[in-house]
């Protein structure tokens, strides 16, 4: 029996144990996960919590040899404990079943392949105003219906994962000639103004989590390179690295809190082949604090300055990719062929730029979220927003109310390394070099 088969046997003999407690904390549901440790275990657990739209208020991560233990304090989107027993049972079953999944490593290239239900298309290229409008127009002309999609933009780059079906059959597109035509026309759209950076259009058969796949696409497209530093310090994340004894690198991150932040960071570390051995997460309205003790999968800390700079850049990019810049617009309407094309064309004709979008359809209903700015990246004037709502339908397109802006993130007092929970617990064990 080789080492890989032996590791699988150990995991089967020691299934994960999940304990959910609503009495241990006054303001959160506590989820404890104990399992055999392997690369990607932490990401699997965080991915389940993220997919359930749970908010991670605090987390404590620790691994001892081949064993892994996590404690998460979570709440729902309304800030309450998770009381529904069916939801709690589902969380437990998902975590226990996911613990056996194999998480594939980061792919070196972006590749279009159909599943039975839909055809998955991945795009990467230079961002520009009207890009999503042009892409959706091409798909409509080719008799493709967008059933769900997610589009991210960051640092002049754009990435998308789009699931489409045939208009007539409502199933995946399998004709290789038609797939080739779709790929060619989409590539022409994405390639425009791409300059020296290659544009990519592929059909993907990957079963990788969609949001993780978007991180991989943008990482492969090197969106972390040459990030402009002119933005105010309060709007940028702070990432620092420090090597300590016991051959750990401590990664400390401070940023404005937002949904799915922990997933984005853990996903990036995992795909960069770093293992989290210990860590803590604490999120507050003003600031989110994350601290991880990591090594490369080869067991070594981050030694070179070049590697340290690359990790910092990549984590900053991971935090920024879906920071909610722009005005959030929510569309609720009857789904129909060409709906996305019509909506995005209206945005383009009114000089709006889509910086991020989530497209979904369910039971004949379209529920889409768009984050928009004007073409210069500035806030959209209210009169333009109202004009667009009149064109699309006031009851269909709504402006999501923004929470009150908090005080400057970097202007608030922060815990030092010694006074954070993890820093306090480990300060007597690990001393800075």
Swiss-Prot record:
Keywords: Repeat. One of its GO terms (molecular function) is amino acid binding. The keyword Signal does not apply. This is ACT domain-containing protein ACR6. InterPro entries: ACR1-12, ACT-like_dom_sf, ACT_dom. It comes from Arabidopsis thaliana (Mouse-ear cress). May bind amino acids. Disulfide bonds: none annotated. Residues 30-110, 120-207, 250-326, 328-402 form the ACT domain. The keyword Transcription does not apply. Pfam families: ACT, ACT_ACR9_3rd. CDD domains: ACT_ACR_2, ACT_ACR_3, ACT_ACR_4.
């Amino acid at each position: 029996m080789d080492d890989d088969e032996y590791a699988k046997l150990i995991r089967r003999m020691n299934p994960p144990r999940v304990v959910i407690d609503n009495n241990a904390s006054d303001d959160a549901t506590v989820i404890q996960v104990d399992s055999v440790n392997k690369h990607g275990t932490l990401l699997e657990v965080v991915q389940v919590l993220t997919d359930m739209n749970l908010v991670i208020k605090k987390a404590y991560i620790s691994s001892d040899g081949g064993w892994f233990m996590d404690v998460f304090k979570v709440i729902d989107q309304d800030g309450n404990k998770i009381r529904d027993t069916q939801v709690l049972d589902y969380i437990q079953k998902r975590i226990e079943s996911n613990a056996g999944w194999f998480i594939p490593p980061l792919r070196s290239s972006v590749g279009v392949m159909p599943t039975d239900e839909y055809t998955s298309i991945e795009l990467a290229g230079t961002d520009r105003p009207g890009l999503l409008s042009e892409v959706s127009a091409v798909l409509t002309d080719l008799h493709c219906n967008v059933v769900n999609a997610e589009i991210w933009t960051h640092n002049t780059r754009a990435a998308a994962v789009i699931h489409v079906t045939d208009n007539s059959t409502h199933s995946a597109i399998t004709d290789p000639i038609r797939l080739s035509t779709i790929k060619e026309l989409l590539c022409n759209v994405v390639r425009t103004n791409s300059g020296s950076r290659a544009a990519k259009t592929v059909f993907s058969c990957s079963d990788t989590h969609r949001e993780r796949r978007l991180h991989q696409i943008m990482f492969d497209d090197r969106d972390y390179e040459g990030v402009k530093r002119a933005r105010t310090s309060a709007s940028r994340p702070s990432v620092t690295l420090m090597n300590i004894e016991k051959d750990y690198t401590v990664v400390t991150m401070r940023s404005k809190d937002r949904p799915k932040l922990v997933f984005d960071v853990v996903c990036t570390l995992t795909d960069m082949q770093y293992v989290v051995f210990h860590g803590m997460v604490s999120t507050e309205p003003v600031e989110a604090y994350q601290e991880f003790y990591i090594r490369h999968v080869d067991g070594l800390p981050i030694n070179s300055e070049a590697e340290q700079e690359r990790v910092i850049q990549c984590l900053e990019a991971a935090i920024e990719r879906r920071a909610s810049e722009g005005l959030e617009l929510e569309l609720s309407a009857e789904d129909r062929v060409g709906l996305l094309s019509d909506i995005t064309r209206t945005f383009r004709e009114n000089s709006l730029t889509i910086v991020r979008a989530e497209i979904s359809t369910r039971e004949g209903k379209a529920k889409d979220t768009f984050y928009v700015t004007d073409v210069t990246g500035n806030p959209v004037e209210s009169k333009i927003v109202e004009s667009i709502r009149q064109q699309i339908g006031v009851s269909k397109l709504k402006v999501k109310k923004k929470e009150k802006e908090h005080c400057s993130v970097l202007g608030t007092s922060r815990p030092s390394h010694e006074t954070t929970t993890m820093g306090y617990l480990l300060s007597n064990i690990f001393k800075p070099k």
